[in-house]
UniProtKB/Swiss-Prot annotation:
GO cellular component: cytoplasm
Localization in the cell: Cytoplasm
Record protein name field: tRNA(Ile)-lysidine synthase
Keyword Nucleotide-binding: yes
GO biological process: tRNA modification
């Protein structure tokens, strides 16, 4: 049979394990004169992997096709399938960045699609729509052009064209859920409902296309409703529940989400909750004062180091803030200040002097509706005695009658 392969006319990175599926994919793309580079990962778990890696290298070199290979080291550990996948895709991403090839091509086929759909179903995942044919990845996209074709069709092609491959013996076992699906459930379904494969894959494709259209609408809606303070909760609540789930996808388009992830997001949106936050990887989605914001979590060691300000004063840069210190006739009396001054982040217990008494800096930031997660990033100016002289962007300390009697004062501007 003839395979219809639709891929960009750009340089491709093709993942090849040495098995039938990926060797057929490489053969098809080579015969179609695509600009290929092979990428191979030796997982370091089976003795046969040495032979497979050498066979992939020989295939590429015989055709003068570029190849990048790596061998994973586990230091005596027995890695899970998820750990192998994470490191495998990390290598793909690394090669894409180094070579500038934006299109990664994988050899998933129709049988893989059926297994994935059933696994999603029995796990109760929110989106039972299988493996996407194209999706964003790293600096480009992942393509799976063999999804319409069955494993048997790939075997038939390999035999007819004398494509050499290596069989991974672990695929014949039933240790993993996917293998149990492959060897026990799929044959039973084929017996009970001949032709179910095409109907199931087609239904999943329709579901996926509908979901993409819905996501396109929600993404556009989110962009239209977004304000400087974030996405208004009221705007999200106007959407149907299924569309509210997709707001999460619109905010974090490069993440994969489970049903539990979506449920945590929907719980965050509940009207009876005044505020809250949920985390997805190194991203934080926060609900504060009627708005939903999505920000990358700052690492503690990324907060700026404290800066010392001497008696000569001048202009200083703390993070993204520019702070100028000068001598004037109004402001904080020099007689009330002990040098050197320090610019640093807010600390628990910080208080600032006002016209009547003092006030916690944390309360000032709450009153100013600064999100909890952003408060540590607000700089304060303190003197050598620990007095808070300014909360940058919000308040200057007030020294009352001392200011009226002072001949020389400190001005802090931002």
């Amino acid at each position: 049979m003839e395979f219809e392969i639709h891929l960009p006319k750009e340089p491709l990175l093709v993942a090849v394990s040495g098995g039938c599926d990926s060797m057929v994919l490489a053969h098809l793309l080579y015969e179609a004169n695509h600009d290929l580079m092979i990428v191979h990962v030796h997982h370091g778990l089976r003795k046969e992997s040495d032979e497979e890696a050498e066979a992939v290298r020989a295939w590429a070199e015989a055709r003068r096709v570029g190849i990048r290979m790596t061998r994973l080291e586990w230091e005596g550990q027995a890695p899970s399938q998820a750990a192998c996948r994470t490191r495998r895709y990390a290598f793909f991403q690394e090669v894409m960045a180094e070579t500038g090839r934006r299109h990664l091509v994988l050899a998933h086929h129709r049988d893989d699609q059926l297994e994935t759909l059933l696994i999603q179903l029995i796990r109760g995942e929110a989106g039972v729509d299988g493996i996407p044919r194209i999706r964003s990845f790293a600096t480009g996209q992942i393509h799976r052009p063999l999804l319409p074709y069955s494993k048997q069709q790939l075997y038939d092609y390999a035999k007819a064209r004398q494509v050499v491959w290596h069989e991974d013996e672990t695929n014949a076992g039933t240790k993993y859920l996917r293998n149990q699906m492959r060897h026990r459930l799929l044959p039973l379904l084929a017996e009970l409902r001949p032709g179910y494969e095409e109907a199931t894959v087609q239904a999943a494709m329709v579901r996926y296309e509908q979901k993409q259209e819905h996501l396109k609408y929600v993404t556009s809606y989110v962009k239209e409703q977004m304000t400087d303070r974030g996405l208004p909760l009221e705007a999200i609540q106007k959407l149907p529940t299924d569309f509210r789930r997709l707001v999460l996808r619109a905010l974090l388009p490069d993440h994969d989400f489970t049903s539990e992830d979506y449920n945590r997001f929907l719980t965050l949106l509940r009207v009876d909750m005044p505020s809250g936050e949920v985390y997805y990887g190194n991203w934080r989605i926060q609900r504060t004062y009627g708005y939903v914001t999505c920000v990358r979590c700052p690492e503690k060691n990324l907060l700026p180091e404290a800066l010392e300000v001497g008696i000569d004063l001048g202009t200083y840069h703390y993070g993204e803030q520019t702070i100028t210190f000068s001598r004037t006739t109004t402001g904080i009396p020099f007689s009330a200040v002990q040098f050197p001054l320090t610019i640093r982040s807010v600390l628990p217990g910080d208080r600032i002097r006002l016209a009547v008494g003092t006030k916690k800096v944390s309360r000032i930031l709450v009153d100013a509706k600064v999100p909890r997660a952003s408060r540590a990033e607000i700089p304060v100016v303190v003197d050598a005695a620990g007095q808070v002289l300014a909360v940058i962007g919000h308040r200057i300390a007030i020294f009352g009658s001392f200011e009226l009697l002072a001949e020389s004062c400190l001005m802090i501007e931002w």
